[in-house]
């Protein structure tokens, strides 16, 4: 019998001056004793020509009494506007996967981003960067391409897709998709899907509740 598992957001405190931020917690549609939990936060602030962006995700999944997924992702990015559409990037990322040979990966890269489209309802940006990645095994060169898409489907409904691919000794693909409904009080209800390939493919869909600030 299917069960719907929802983790409820208890509290969040974010200093004044933040913009376009949200925190969400959620669970997955599960069968029998399978269960999944998901947590994420996004922070975005613009100051003059600078844009500061933080993103974090955590996903945990069990099948029966066996843990099959335990992953974390953290990204800190500084963008500096060069033109109306182009910008320079400085990027620090960390991701953890308990079941990967190199369970910890940290990368530091620089690059260039371009705003492909900006309208009242749709935003598309593409970024490419080069740098160094360190894992449990060694240092290696890495080239990263990311494509970000956001579309306001209706007044209260937003669709977001973030695609990222690393070209290194081993290819890493990550795609996060969200569909959110926002209430007047800042409460968010939504559904999200997280797909990763590194090299094992993992895919989980969760139903989330959260708050925007």
Please annotate each region the language model reported.
Residues 18-58:
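Short glycine/proline- and aromatic-enriched beta-strand/turn motifs that initiate or cap beta-hairpins
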Residues 21, 48-54, 84-88, 119-124, ...:
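Repeated loop/turn-to-beta-strand initiation elements of outer-membrane beta-barrel proteins
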Residues 25-29, 54-58, 76, 90-94, ...:
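Transmembrane beta-barrel strands of outer-membrane/channel proteins
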Residues 28-37, 62-70, 97-104, 133-141, ...:
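Solvent-exposed loop/turn segments connecting transmembrane beta-strands
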Residues 35-41, 72-76, 92, 106-110, ...:
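Hydrophobic, lipid-facing positions within transmembrane beta-strands of outer-membrane proteins
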Residues 43-45, 80, 94, 114-116, ...:
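Residue-level signature of outer-membrane beta-barrel architecture
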Residues 109-111, 115, 119-165:
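Detector for outer-membrane/organellar transmembrane beta-barrel domains
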Residues 180-182, 188, 202-213:
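Outer-membrane beta-barrel "beta-signal"
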């Amino acid at each position: 019998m299917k069960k719907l598992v929802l983790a409820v957001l208890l509290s969040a405190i974010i200093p004044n001056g933040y913009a376009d931020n949200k925190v969400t917690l959620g669970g997955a549609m599960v069968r029998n004793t399978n269960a999944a939990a998901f947590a994420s936060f996004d922070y975005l602030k613009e100051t003059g020509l600078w844009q500061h962006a933080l993103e974090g995700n955590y996903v945990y999944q069990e099948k029966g009494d066996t843990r099959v997924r335990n992953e974390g992702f953290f990204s800190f990015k500084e963008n500096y506007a060069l033109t109306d559409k182009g910008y320079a990037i400085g990027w620090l990322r960390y991701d953890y996967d308990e079941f990967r040979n190199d369970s910890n990966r940290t990368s530091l890269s620089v690059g260039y981003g371009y705003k492909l489209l900006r309208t009242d309802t749709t935003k598309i940006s593409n970024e490419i960067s080069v740098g160094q990645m360190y894992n449990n095994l060694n240092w290696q060169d890495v080239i990263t391409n990311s494509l970000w898409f956001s579309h306001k489907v209706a007044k209260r409904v937003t669709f977001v897709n973030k695609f990222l691919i690393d070209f290194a000794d081993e290819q890493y693909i990550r795609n996060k998709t969200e569909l959110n409904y926002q209430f007047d009080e800042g409460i968010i209800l939504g559904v999200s899907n997280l797909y990763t390939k590194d090299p094992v493919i993992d895919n989980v869909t969760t139903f989330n509740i959260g708050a925007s600030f």
